[in-house]
């Protein structure tokens, strides 16, 4: 049995869409009919659905053999895992966003402090960073901050809140990570799972 931790939300939706394109209907059916289940078994695979930021922790602790998680999560943390390969779904990007009239930034809200700090340091701009867990756009709307650094996929949320993208910071994509021991002990199972995803590890071992 190979245990796979997958981030709920945006990435899970992208994963299901990709599985449909790969004609992996058994996995698609199990994920779409899960209701509130967090543990799903399909053949020799057990899927664990967790919060994105928890995926590398489940993998690091050995509860999950492999994980599917956004590169944004990995860049913000420091985990003892194998970061194996990019996956062909889940593409989006980090962006600096603000009201259209805003041209200078002194105070920024974000859930991604490490990424935001690196961006502004590279720009030579000294800003105060306010860490928030959700509804980042609101901080800009109530003028608590001058702008936000957040993940943008379609831009719909920004537009609906009267915000615009001021700069694209860096791309984000889905990554396959593995537990360090599982990487060797379950190499054949991992290869079989990646074959399902039409991804090869030939260049990564």
UniProtKB/Swiss-Prot annotation:
GO cellular component assignments: cytoplasm
EC category name: transferase
One function term, GO molecular function aspect: ATP binding
Entry-linked InterPro entries: ATP_PRibTrfase_cat, ATP_PRibTrfase_HisG, ATP_PRibTrfase_HisG_short
Alphabetical list of CDD domains matching this protein: PBP2_HisGs
Keywords attached to this entry: Amino-acid biosynthesis, ATP-binding, Cytoplasm, Glycosyltransferase, Histidine biosynthesis, Nucleotide-binding, Transferase
TM region positions: none
Predominant cellular place of this UniProt entry's protein: cytoplasm
Pfam families assigned: HisG
Subcellular localization, as worded in the UniProt entry: Cytoplasm
Pathway per the UniProt entry: Amino-acid biosynthesis; L-histidine biosynthesis; L-histidine from 5-phospho-alpha-D-ribose 1-diphosphate: step 1/9
Domain notes from UniProt: Lacks the C-terminal regulatory region which is replaced by HisZ.
Subunit details: Heteromultimer composed of HisG and HisZ subunits.
Functional description taken from the UniProt entry: Catalyzes the condensation of ATP and 5-phosphoribose 1-diphosphate to form N'-(5'-phosphoribosyl)-ATP (PR-ATP). Has a crucial role in the pathway because the rate of histidine biosynthesis seems to be controlled primarily by regulation of HisG enzymatic activity.
Name the record gives this protein: ATP phosphoribosyltransferase
Organism: Staphylococcus saprophyticus subsp. saprophyticus (strain ATCC 15305 / DSM 20229 / NCIMB 8711 / NCTC 7292 / S-41)
